[in-house]
C-alpha cells in the first residue's frame, strides 16, 4: 500500500503563504530600507490625494443678487443639496457679501449717519419755526383777517398788495395833475374909482382914488415849492406878521425879498417848501389868513 494513500488532497491554492514576509526576511538590509521608503512615500501620496479630493469638493454656489421690484432677492443657479435656502441664511450671506464689497456712498438712501440725521431734523425744525414766525408777522399787517391759516393769510396779503398798488397809481396821477397846474392865482384887486368933476374954467380932470382893498396876493405852486407874492401897503410889523403866518401852515421859508413900490406900498416875495400833505384847501386858508394878518 502506498504511503500517500492516507494523505488528504490539497492544492497550491490552499497554501496561504505570505511571500512578502518571506521576501522581507530574506532581503538584504539595503533592499529593506528602500522598500520602507517606498511604502512611506506611497502612504504620503495617499494622504495628499485624499486632501486634494477634499479641496476639490464642490462648494455651494454663491447666489447672485438681482433687484426686482425695488427688493433684493437671491437667485441660485446651483441645485445641489449643499446650498442653504433659508431666509436667515440668505441674510447672513448678503451681509457678508456687502461687507466684502466696496464702501457704500454716504449719499445713498438709508445710509445717513445718526449725527447727520439729527442735524437735518434740527435744521428742518428751525426752518419751520422761522416760516411760522413770518406768517404770524404777515397776519399782523393785514387788517380784518378772519382766519389764521396760511392759505387765507397769503390770499389776503395778495389782495391787499393789489389794493395798495392801485391806490399808489391813483395818487401818482393826482400828483402829476397838480404839478401840471403851474400856478394858481388868488387875487383880490383894489377897487378903482374914477370921479370926474366938470370944471368949466379948465379941462376935465380925472381923480383916481384907491380903496383900502389891498393887499393883492398871488400864489404859485411848482412841485414842492410855493411862491407867494404880496403887494400891500406899508405898515409897521407887516413883514413879521406875513412870515409868522406862513410858518404856522408848516411851510419852510427858503427866501424872502421886500421891495418898496412908491411911498406907501411894499412888494413882498416869499419862496417856501411845502410838505406832501399840503393841499389846495390849505392854500386857500393860507391866503385868507395872510389877508387878515395885514389888515
From Swiss-Prot:
Which Pfam families does the record associate with it? HLH (PF00010)
Q: Which PROSITE patterns match?
A: BHLH
The alphabetized UniProt keywords are:
DNA-binding, Nucleus, Transcription, Transcription regulation
* Gene3D superfamilies linked: Helix-loop-helix DNA-binding domain
Q: Does the keyword Cytoplasm apply?
A: no
Primary localisation category: nucleus
Please provide, in alphabetical order, the Gene Ontology terms of the cellular component aspect for this entry: nucleus
The induction annotation reads: By cold treatment.
The compartments listed are:
Nucleus
Residues in bHLH domain copies: 115-164
Keyword Cell division, does the record have it?
no
A molecular function annotated in GO for this UniProt entry is: DNA-binding transcription factor activity
Tell me which tissues or organs this protein is expressed in: Expressed in roots and leaves.
Q: Could you tell me which SMART domains the record lists for this protein?
A: HLH
Assembly and interaction partners: Homodimer.
Any idea what this protein is called? Transcription factor bHLH19
Organism name: Arabidopsis thaliana (Mouse-ear cress)
Taxonomic lineage is:
Eukaryota, Viridiplantae, Streptophyta, Embryophyta, Tracheophyta
